[in-house]
Amino acid sequence: MSRLLLNCDIGESFGSWTMGLDAEVMPFIDCANIACGFHAGDPSIMRKTVSLALSHGVKIGAHPAYQDLVGFGRRSMAYTAQELQDILHYQIGALDGICRAQGGKVSYVKPHGAMYNDMMANPAQLRAVIQAVVAYDRSLPLMLMATRDNTAAQQLGDEYGVTLWFEAFADRAYDSAGRLVSRQLPGAVHHDCETIIGQALTIARGDNLTASDGSALHLQANTLCVHGDNASSVAAVQRIRQALNEQSAP
């Protein structure tokens, strides 16, 4: 079984408002996707989250979004390709500066929410995102959604010489095309701990998932997204980490 990197969306608090159990989940993940202020987070939260990640030896990823604090970055917005690249550079650069001030660095980029979904549905937008990463730092991998067929995205990444990390989700339902089922639909998010752990191990083994229409779905992924929103989800992350370590042990 190939080793999957565990990643988690982190640093999504804002001011005195707290979201997520970042300190509790950080010891069990490989990569922290840190909000950059447009959908969540602020300069102080970003600094504290970077410090936490560095203290645990966790890779830091920029988690940029549309400028949508009210909608938590989950609403599609119309941007030109240049405007999209501008907001990506603004957010990646902000986090990178905070990292450098603490002796760290941004190691990859993972767009958030609607931006993440939109770039998977629109090849022109994916191209614009890749161009933004190339212009900032070609060595940064771009994390994007693993689907039934990663070929088109991989070809675009190869065209620009960008490393792509394909991501699967332990706690989300998939449709037959390998896209995430909309959060507006029932059953889109798994809440049962055993279901989440089972899906994580199925993906790690390279076995087929069952899509929402009952069809078999194979996802070829490099990294697995987990969440630490509450005590039960943190417990699930801990068990996934332990199970993956056991599965990959010689």
UniProtKB/Swiss-Prot annotation:
Gene Ontology MF annotations: 5-oxoprolinase (ATP-hydrolyzing) activity; ATP binding
Presence of keyword ATP-binding: yes
EC number(s) reported in the record: 3.5.2.9
Quaternary structure and interacting proteins, as annotated: Forms a complex composed of PxpA, PxpB and PxpC.
Matches recorded under NCBIfam families: PRK05406.1-3 (NF003814), PRK05406.1-5 (NF003816)
Job description of the protein: Catalyzes the cleavage of 5-oxoproline to form L-glutamate coupled to the hydrolysis of ATP to ADP and inorganic phosphate.
Family according to the record: Belongs to the LamB/PxpA family.
Protein name per the record: 5-oxoprolinase subunit A
Organism: Pseudomonas fluorescens (strain Pf0-1)
Lineage: Bacteria, Pseudomonadati, Pseudomonadota, Gammaproteobacteria, Pseudomonadales
